[in-house]
A protein has these predicted regions:
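Glycine-rich flexible loops
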Residues: 1-236
């Protein structure tokens, strides 16, 4: 049996929480979707394996890849779409966690021509500016070239929509990435519901967004949200 450092064990435990929290918040899609985690600037990363649901992940099922997709630790298969993660990691050394899932409302919302608005608190986390949309293909991102294109679309943003496919979220902490993925789905859902009204809908004016972000999305509040999600999952 392989041995792991304390730091490696903790990273795998946090990544397991990330996967299960996303599943607990409606982002499971049978065995599809994946999350990765690394130390900032590292040339390897831990990843959820293929053929396993987000809700099924345990610390000992995770695999570690290099940026070329070679498995350097673990025995299970990797996802074909590892280039989403590797190319964002190459492009942005500060990023430690990348989430790619297929949440229902985000897919539906991104298929419209609406820009995301701050219809809800969650929307204010992302816009303005608008959340970018990757439109080159709705197929799987299985090559370095396509991964680079996704990373270019994301740019310096936290999130982007993959049209008719899913979402990508990247952040400097695993907690931030997971919460942002959940909040993007919530923001997409609320705006879809509001836009279905024949009466039109309102959203927070752009000039009020900085104050709203400063009040709602503080590190202390985000830590409390993460801890709540972890309590729902229980010990790992």
């Amino acid at each position: 049996m392989p041995t792991f450092s304390h730091e490696s064990l903790e990273m795998r435990r946090l990544l397991t929480y990330a996967c299960r929290i996303l599943a607990d918040n409606g982002q499971n899609d049978t065995v599809f979707g994946h999350v990765t985690y690394r130390e900032a600037g590292a040339d390897t990363f831990w990843m959820k394996p293929a053929a396993m649901g987000l809700d099924e992940v345990t610390p000992d099922t995770l695999i570690r890849l290099d940026l070329d997709g070679t498995i350097v630790e673990g025995e299970l298969r990797r996802h074909l779409e590892f280039p989403i993660h590797s190319e964002i990691f190459r492009a942005r050394s500060e990023i430690t966690c990348v989430v790619h899932t297929h949440p229902l409302y985000s897919i539906a919302f991104a298929a419209t021509e609406q820009p995301l608005r701050a219809v809800s608190h969650e929307g204010a986390q992302f816009t303005p500016p608008d959340v970018p949309r990757f439109t080159r293909t709705s197929d799987l991102i299985t090559s370095r070239e396509l991964g680079e294109a996704v990373a270019a679309t994301l740019g310096e943003a936290t999130s982007c929509y993959l049209i008719n496919h899913g979402i990508v979220v990247a952040a400097t902490t695993i907690e931030e990435a997971v919460i942002a993925a959940i909040n993007l789905e919530r923001a997409s859902q609320v705006q879809l519901l509001a836009s279905a009204s024949s009466q039109g809908f309102s959203w927070t004016p752009d000039e009020q967004i900085p104050g709203k972000r400063a009040n709602i999305f503080t590190p202390r509040h985000m830590r409390s949200v993460w801890e709540y999600y972890c309590r729902r999952i229980g010990p790992i």
